[in-house]
C-alpha cells in the first residue's frame, strides 16, 4: 500500500533579497499579492546568505552555488574562494602538485602555459588574485611563454568594469618579464551552461587557434573597441591579442592549459570541449594534446587533474532523507537545475535513493529580460502535479527568475519576473494546503532588489549581500532571529520530527507552538 505523504516544500527564490532602500528595487515595486498575504498571515523573518555566514570572506556577496551548498548541507561550508585565497597567502598554492606538474611538463617540452578564466574581482566564479598567483607561479617555475585568455565579467561586476583588470595584468606581465594577455571574450560565450554550443565554439577557436572576430595589439584597445560596438564586458566578441610581431597565440601539443574558475556550473561545457575525445557539441578544427588542469572539481565525469579536489560532505539533507527511507523531489529550470541537485547534495552528481528529479528547459532566448517569466508556468505545473501525487516527503524547488533577470540589469523585466514568481507561489501554496503540506520560502542570495548602482548610476547586474526572506507557510510557529542558510536543512528535519545529524551544525529556526 502506498503511504500518502504530507510534504514539506522548500521554495528557493533565486536572487531575491530584502533591501530597505526602495529605489530601483524590483521586488519592492513588483505587485506580489501572494507573498504579501503570506507575510501577513504566517511566521516570517530574514536570514543571511553572504559573507562569513556561508563560508565566504567577510562582506563577500553570496551566490547560487554557495547558497545551495549551505542550504543542503546544514553547515557553513568553507568556500573555494576562501580556501584558495588562504592557500595563496600561506604560500601553499605555488607548491600545488597538479599545477606544478602541468607547468613543469610544458616548460620541459618547450611549450606554453595557457591560463584561462573569468578575469574579475567578483569572487563568484573566480578571482583575479588567483589568476595573478598562477601567472606568477608559472613564470617562477621557468615558463617564458605564458598566455592569459581572459573571460570578461560584467555580470558579477559592473557592466563596463574590465579595463582596470586588463591594465593591471598588462603591468604584471611587464614586471614579470614574461607572458601577455592573448585573448579576451565575454563570459556570455566562454561560460555558457545551457548547451548553446555556438557560443562556446567561439571561445574554443579563440584559445586553440587564435581565431577571432577581431584582432588587436593590446587588450585595453580591444575592450575599448568592444564598447564602441556597444558590447558590455559580458558580451565582448572574440578578440585575439597579437604580440609585437603581429602573431596570435595558439594552443599546441605539449602546452599546459589551466582553468582558473573555481565554480563548476559554468566551467563544465568549455572544459568538456577541450578534454572529451567523443565531444560532439560542435566541430573542432583542432584538438591539441595538452596538460589540462581544473582548479576545482567540475563534474565526476570530467577526467582531468584537479588542483583543489572537493571536500567530502557527509550527511547532507539529501543523504539523511535517503538513510531515513524518505522520498524527495528536486525540480528547477535548466539554469538552476545543477543547484538543486549537484550543489544541494554537496557536490555529488548521482541522485540519492528515493530522490527524483524534474528538469524544465529554460527558454531559448538571448537574455532573460526578453522572457522574464522564463519557464515558471511549466515548472509550476509539474510542481503542483508532484504535490498532488502525494508521493514525496520533501520537495526542493528553485525559481531562477529573480536572479537570471536581475543579471540583465533591466528593471522593468525584473519587476515582471518577480510578479510571475509570486503568481506561481500562490498555486504551489494552494496545492500544498489541499494535501496538508507545509512550505518554507527563502532565497539563496540577493539580486533583484538592487537594479542600479547608486554610486556609478550603471545598471546593477551583480548579486548583493542583503539578507533574504524566510517564510514558514504551515503550523502556527515562531522563527528565531539571526539565522543563516545553513540553518534551513536542520529546520526541515526538525519539522519532520527527524533527529539532526552531528555533521549539521546549523540550528532549527522554526518552533511550532504547542
Curated annotation (Swiss-Prot):
One of its GO terms (molecular function) is phosphoglycerate mutase activity. The keyword Manganese applies. Its EC number is 5.4.2.12. Binds 2 manganese ions per subunit. Mn(2+) 1 binds at residues 403, 407, 463. Pathway: Carbohydrate degradation; glycolysis; pyruvate from D-glyceraldehyde 3-phosphate: step 3/5. InterPro entries: Alkaline_phosphatase_core_sf, BPG-indep_PGM_N, Metalloenzyme, PGAM_B_sf, Pgm_bpd_ind. Substrate binds at residues 125, 155-156, 187, 193, 263-266, 336. One of its GO terms (biological process) is glycolytic process. It is an enzyme of class 5 (isomerase). GO terms for cellular component: cytosol. It catalyses: (2R)-2-phosphoglycerate = (2R)-3-phosphoglycerate. Keywords: Glycolysis, Isomerase, Manganese, Metal-binding. Its cofactor is Mn(2+). The active site is at residue 64. Mn(2+) 2 binds at residues 14, 64, 444-445. Monomer. Belongs to the BPG-independent phosphoglycerate mutase family. Catalyzes the interconversion of 2-phosphoglycerate and 3-phosphoglycerate. This is 2,3-bisphosphoglycerate-independent phosphoglycerate mutase. It comes from Shewanella sp. (strain ANA-3).
